[in-house]
Amino acid sequence: MPKKATEVTSPHISQITDYLYISAFPRGEHVAEIVALGVRLVLSMHWMRPTKMLGAPPVTLLWLPTFDFILLPMPIRTLNKGVLAALLAIREGGSVLVHCKSGVHRSVAQAACVLIGMGYTADDAMQLIKEKRAVADPEARHIQSRIRKFAKQWPEVKDS
């Protein structure tokens, strides 16, 4: 396995923890850096299908198309699916990159849910993301409500 890069060089990618990154919509030119960071799973929250290059081994791509629209909430089942896949990748020693169009709302919601799956509270997850990614807006009403709803139902999902 190639040696993991020690720092992010792309301004589009923010490292949240040792195992979690958030970015805007990555392009083909970002694939080498994503692989070098040890990313083994990309969770794509954009409604447009991402480049197939993002899913080339050793990386797996999980496309979870969602919309950033206050009247069309992100489905909790979609967030659950992303978290379950992320936890598996993390347990296997890989990192996870979550992206949407701008890396502000949908990716932030999914990343917060991954952190909750790892044991963070909703408040701690949102705070950490805000500290690590300046453009992140987990407090947008339609995003925060999804994070909190996910946190409330997660104990039942993880135990099932």
Language-model features and meaning:
Residues 152-160:
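C-terminal domain-closing interface element
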